From Swiss-Prot:
The lineage of its organism: Bacteria, Pseudomonadati, Thermodesulfobacteriota, Desulfobacteria, Desulfobacterales. This is Large ribosomal subunit protein bL20. Binds directly to 23S ribosomal RNA and is necessary for the in vitro assembly process of the 50S ribosomal subunit. It is not involved in the protein synthesizing functions of that subunit. Belongs to the bacterial ribosomal protein bL20 family. InterPro entries: Ribosomal_bL20 (IPR005813), RIBOSOMAL_L20_CS (IPR049946), Ribosomal_protein_bL20_C (IPR035566). PROSITE patterns: RIBOSOMAL_L20. GO terms for molecular function: rRNA binding; structural constituent of ribosome. Keywords: Ribonucleoprotein, Ribosomal protein, RNA-binding, rRNA-binding. NCBIfam families: rplT_bact (TIGR01032). HAMAP family: Ribosomal_bL20. One of its GO terms (cellular component) is ribonucleoprotein complex. It comes from Desulfatibacillum aliphaticivorans.
Length: 116
C-alpha cells in the first residue's frame, strides 16, 4: 500500500509561514522566499544574541571610563583599584551608578584611587 505524507508537508510550510509573519511582501506569503528569509533571520538572531553581550559590555566600559576620567582616573587604573580594594561591583552596576548617581560613583572612584 502506498504511504502518503498527508498533513506533514502542510504543517511544515505552515510553521515556516508563521515564523515569517510580519515580513514584507512575498517574504511572508510565498513559502520558498519565506523559508530563505526565516533561515537567515534565525541565523542573525543566534549570532546577535551573542553579539549583544559584547555590545553591552563595550557600552558599560565606555560609560565607566567617562565617569572615571571625570574623577581624574583612567578606566584601567579604576578597575585595578577596585580589584585591590575587594569591591565586588560588576561593570553593569558601575555604569548605571556613573549615570544615575555621580556622587556615589565619585566616592567609589576615590576608593579605587587610594588603592591604585
Amino acid at each position: 500500500m502506498r504511504v502518503k505524507r498527508g498533513f506533514k508537508a502542510r504543517r511544515r510550510r505552515k510553521k515556516v509561514l508563521k515564523l515569517a509573519k510580519g515580513f514584507r511582501g512575498g517574504h511572508s506569503k510565498l513559502y520558498r522566499t519565506a523559508a530563505d528569509t526565516v533561515d537567515r533571520a534565525l541565523m542573525y538572531a543566534y549570532r546577535d544574541r551573542r553579539q549583544k553581550k559584547r555590545d553591552f559590555r563595550a557600552l558599560w566600559i565606555a560609560r565607566i571610563n567617562a565617569g572615571a576620567r571625570m574623577n581624574g582616573l583612567s578606566y584601567s587604573k579604576f578597575i585595578y583599584g577596585l580589584k585591590q580594594a575587594d569591591v565586588a561591583l560588576d561593570r553593569k552596576v558601575l555604569a548605571e551608578l556613573a549615570i544615575s548617581d555621580p556622587a556615589c560613583f565619585a566616592e567609589i572612584t576615590s576608593l579605587a584611587a587610594k588603592q591604585a
